[in-house]
Design a protein with these regions (language model features):
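Terminal substrate-recognition subdomain of acyl/acetyltransferases
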Residues: 1-10, 152-169
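Short glycine/proline-centered loop/turn elements that form peptide/ligand docking sites
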Residues: 101, 105, 127-131, 148-154
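A short, internal acetyl-CoA/4′-phosphopantetheine-binding micro-motif in the GNAT/acyltransferase core
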Residues: 89-97, 124-127
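Acetyl-CoA-dependent GNAT
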Residues: 9-94, 102-107, 111, 115, ...
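Conserved catalytic-core motifs of GNAT/GCN5-like acyltransferases
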Residues: 123-124, 136, 141-157
Length: 169
């Protein structure tokens, strides 16, 4: 395949890579991330608000990228000494179900575990069955019900041990 040929399979060139600080992102890149979050969760954020997220630069700033465009984001913060909170985990809808979510989770979890993080929590739309299944296989369980958390949709607060790989459950 010619490196300059855009007709090649984008899947072959995607990988989860560390992201620079959002304060260094261009406005165009922020708008694309905002759109990705909106398309996958229904949440709409101001780009300035995104730049203010307290992301942990050591384990909580990842993008699924082909080197030119972002197709996914995984953003997390340190909640306390041993707990991380996932703030955003979105993958382009046409790439969902292809293993990129599991790869993104493992990338984040390995980096966080190496820094002493032992637990993780997040919020997820109650109707996002594939994501809930991914989290459940990694030991997270619903710990609270969030009414109206996502514009017209309820959510779950999920918590559990931080696992790099899925269990067989």
């Amino acid at each position: 395949m010619n490196e300059n040929d855009d007709s090649g399979d984008v899947l072959d060139h995607l990988e989860w890579v560390k992201s620079p600080s959002l304060s260094h992102w261009t406005n165009h890149r922020l708008i694309e991330a905002r759109q990705l979050i909106y398309e996958t969760t229904g949440e709409l954020y101001d780009t300035k608000r995104l730049q203010m997220l307290p992301l942990d630069e050591r384990f909580g700033m990842w993008v699924l990228s082909d080197g030119r465009k972002d197709y996914g984001i995984f953003w997390a913060m340190k909640l306390n000494k041993q707990t991380a909170r996932v703030l955003a985990f979105s993958i382009s809808t046409d790439l969902q179900g292809k293993g990129f979510g599991a790869q993104g989770w493992s990338t984040f979890a390995l980096a966080a575990k190496n820094l002493g993080i032992k637990r993780v929590q997040l919020e997820v739309r109650q109707d996002n069955t594939p994501a809930i299944r991914l989290y459940h296989r990694r030991g997270l369980r619903p710990r609270g019900y969030i009414t109206g958390f996502y514009r017209g949709h309820d959510g779950w607060l999920m918590m559990g041990p931080l696992r790099v790989q899925a269990s067989s459950q």
